[in-house]
């Protein structure tokens, strides 16, 4: 966290099964100054997920009430479940100097880029569709029909990677984490993100 600058906002998207969540978790655990925006969702919690940590789990009625209040920076219906990013939560973290990670799908990413053109888009790619299919099957949480739907959707999502600023191939977790960190550090060093420090330096020269 920096006292001199507003935090960057990083949009990290990927097709389901690419390892996005694992990568983001490693980045948060191993590096300072980063916070993840905890999304709201109407889907049931998976084993090991905690409310307020992995997601804010809410009912469909609660979610639709928040939509009516314009509380979301973006939201989407994904396979019958709502997912949304709180505008207030993101703004508070960025204002405090944290770099904020939005772990969202390509539909939500487009909404955020329209609202926040300065946000940095990062797309995580699988090394191949065979590896992606194996990862989805290995999770053991989805039926064969759902897996086929996810693979079909993955092709469309990967086509949308052209709309992002950076792409990272997740073939090796450690290398992919390092690639993500390089992107984060490069964005932190942009002159436009150091204006507060420069002004303070000149004022006290």
Swiss-Prot record:
PROSITE patterns for this protein: GUANYLATE_KINASE_1 (PS00856), GUANYLATE_KINASE_2 (PS50052)
Protein name per the record: Guanylate kinase
Listed transmembrane segments: none
EC number from the UniProt entry: 2.7.4.8
Gene: gmk
Highest rank taxon of the organism: Bacteria
One example GO MF annotation: guanylate kinase activity
GO cellular component, one term: cytosol
A matching Pfam family: Guanylate_kin
Catalytic activity: GMP + ATP = GDP + ADP
Family: Belongs to the guanylate kinase family.
Residues annotated as binding ATP: 14-21
Subcellular location: Cytoplasm
């Amino acid at each position: 966290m920096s006292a001199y600058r507003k935090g960057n906002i990083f949009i990290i998207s990927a097709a389901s099964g690419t390892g996005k969540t694992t990568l983001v978790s490693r980045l948060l655990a191993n590096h300072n100054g980063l916070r993840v925006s905890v999304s709201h969702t109407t889907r049931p919690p998976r084993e090991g997920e905690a409310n307020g940590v992995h997601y804010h789990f809410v009912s469909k009625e609660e979610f639709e009430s928040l939509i009516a209040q314009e509380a979301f920076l973006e939201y989407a219906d994904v396979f019958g479940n709502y997912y949304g990013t709180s505008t207030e939560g993101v703004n508070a973290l960025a204002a405090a100097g944290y770099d904020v990670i939005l772990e969202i799908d390509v539909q939500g990413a487009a909404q955020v880029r329209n609202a926040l053109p300065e946000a940095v888009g990062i797309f995580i790619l699988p090394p191949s569709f065979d590896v992606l299919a194996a990862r989805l099957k290995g999770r053991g949480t989805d039926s064969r029909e759902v897996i086929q739907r996810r693979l079909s959707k993955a092709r469309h999502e990967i086509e949308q990677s052209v709309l992002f600023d950076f792409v990272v191939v997740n073939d090796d977790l450690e290398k992919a984490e390092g690639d993500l960190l390089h992107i984060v550090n490069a964005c932190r060093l942009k002159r436009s993100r150091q204006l507060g420090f420069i002004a303070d330096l000149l004022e006290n020269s």
